[in-house]
């Protein structure tokens, strides 16, 4: 099973290399927030649960992040996770 942070770095680097600098910056900012919340740059995909996501959202709101920032970071996490599922790196978890 893969590591969310490593995969986010890989995706952000690919975006930067293809000239999508703004999107790459958002991915890196989101990644930094996840690392700050989790306390480590090692986060297995299996630990990215509904409870983890709710706690992360609460953490961001507790840091006085705007709703737009919270929404952007959560969307970014969803996009990265879905990309990992497509590549069979992360498990598909139906809701």
Residue ranges and their predicted role:
Residues 1-63, 82:
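Basic/aromatic-enriched alpha-helical hairpins
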Residues 47-50, 83-95:
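Short, charged hinge/linker segments at domain and secondary-structure junctions
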Residues 66:
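Hydrophobic, aromatic-lined core segments that form the binding pocket/scaffold
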Residues 74:
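DNA major-groove recognition helix of helix-turn-helix
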């Amino acid at each position: 099973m893969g590591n969310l942070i490593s995969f986010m770095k890989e995706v952000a680097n690919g975006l930067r290399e293809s000239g999508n600098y703004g999107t790459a910056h958002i991915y890196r900012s989101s990644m930094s927030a996840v690392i700050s919340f989790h306390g480590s740059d090692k986060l297995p995909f299996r630990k990215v649960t509904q409870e983890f996501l709710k706690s992360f959202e609460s953490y961001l709101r507790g840091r006085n992040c705007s709703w737009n920032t919270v929404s952007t970071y959560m969307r970014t996490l969803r996009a990265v996770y879905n990309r990992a599922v497509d590549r069979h790196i992360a498990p598909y978890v139906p809701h």
